[in-house]
Design a protein with these regions (language model features):
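Bacterial N-terminal signal peptides that target proteins for export
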Residues: 2-10
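Short, contiguous pre-domain boundary segments
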Residues: 62-70
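C-terminal motif of bacterial Sec signal peptides marking the signal peptidase cleavage site
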Residues: 19-21
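Collagen/collagen-like triple-helix recognition
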Residues: 24-63, 265
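Inter-heme linker and motif-flanking segments adjacent to c-type heme-binding CXXCH motifs
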Residues: 60, 73-97, 104-279, 326-330
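Mature extracytoplasmic or organellar-lumen-exposed domains after removal of signal/transit peptides
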Residues: 265-273, 277-349
């Protein structure tokens, strides 16, 4: 029996080998089966080494460039500030009046900028500046708004409609900025029964009526025309008081006058200042004699609270020319003469 089983096993092995020997070559690989589901992510590998530093970004580059555009080793800022520090605007104690609502819009640098931004007249502020400051770069220029050279642009150069003189507008180029303050605060009042009342120690046009003098308006008893310096001088105030070099002392330079008055050696061109000073002295003496003026100097102030219209007319024009405009006729010689003539005529009434 065992022999029979062994023989059968050998036979099966022989048959298997025979079949294997008769098999053909392997066929081509079948198509790939569908992808199986995605396996879970493996663990995070270690961080690679730090790469080289990149170039400076745009923000850092812009910040550096715009600062050094002004804050550099030139005298661009220091020179202007040195000149400004000795100017009337950059020195003195006038800024202390900025705590008053009626004064802050011109006497405080910060309040001036704020009211210009809001489009207000000097008399439209509701409150004074609790911390008034002298006028500085930011008062007239748009400092630190773009951090580029555009920051030196003026706060405004729009024509200025006077807030006290009805219907009057000043359009003098860059000088328009100045006229936002350098304009009359009052006009000559109407007489009541031949008398002018409410005269105070600080009566008159108030400080800075140079713009109205240039336009030939704002006086008492006289009508004028715009002076030649309003129409012929480019940028009016800026043209004369800063010149081509834009000097920030604001002291006028005779060299500017010499563009037209080639032989000028001072501001007394054709003797106009000598003439006007003599007439002012004569008028001041008459007003002191009339008992309405304390003294015939820059320290002189009205000593009465009311006066006849003629006397008040003379006093108003003396204050306008002597105390407030202070150009001794340079701003508008014909109108200055007309104001003095009206003053003397009024005293004789």
């Amino acid at each position: 029996m065992k022999l029979k089983h062994l023989s059968l096993g050998i036979l099966l092995l022989v048959l298997a080998l025979a079949l294997a020997a008769c098999a053909g070559p392997a066929g081509p690989q079948g198509p790939a089966g569908p992808a199986g589901p995605e396996g879970p992510p493996g663990p995070e590998g270690p961080a690679g080494p730090a790469g080289p530093p990149g170039e400076a970004g745009a923000a850092a580059e812009m910040a550096e460039l715009t600062c050094v555009e002004c804050h550099n080793d030139t005298t661009l800022i220091s020179g202007k500030r040195a000149a400004w520090s000795v100017s009337g605007h950059g020195s003195g104690e006038a800024f202390l009046r900025g705590t008053s609502a009626t004064c802050a819009g011109c006497h405080s640098g910060g309040a001036f900028s704020a009211r210009i931004a809001e489009g207000l007249n000097p008399d439209e502020l509701e409150a004074g500046d609790p911390s008034p400051s002298r006028q500085d770069c930011r008062t007239c220029h748009q400092i630190h708004t773009t951090y580029t050279a555009e920051d030196f642009a003026l706060e405004t150069t729009d024509p200025v409609a006077f807030f006290a003189v009805e219907g009057a507008t000043y359009d003098g180029g860059l000088g328009n900025l100045c006229v936002n303050c350098h304009q009359p605060r009052r006009v000559f009042p109407e007489a009541v029964d031949g008398m002018i009342t409410d005269i105070t120690e600080h009566w008159g046009t108030h400080h800075g009526p140079q713009s109205s003098m240039l336009l030939g308006i704002g006086g008492a008893g006289a009508e004028g025309q715009p002076g030649i310096h309003y129409s012929a001088v480019e940028d009016t105030c800026v043209g004369c008081h800063m010149g081509e070099g834009r000097t920030h002392t604001f002291a006028p330079n005779v060299a500017t006058c010499q563009a037209c008055h080639t032989d000028a050696e001072n501001f007394d061109i054709n003797g106009v200042q000598t003439e006007i000073q003599a007439e002012l002295d004569r008028l001041g003496e008459a007003l002191v004699a009339a008992g309405v003026l304390s003294e015939n100097t820059l320290e002189g102030h009205p000593t009465v609270t009311e006066a006849p219209e003629g006397v008040a007319t003379a006093l108003y024009n003396w204050l306008y020319i002597h105390h407030e405009d202070r150009s001794l006729g340079v701003h508008n010689p014909p109108f200055t003469r007309a104001l003095l003539e009206a003053a003397f005529a009024a005293l004789e009434q």
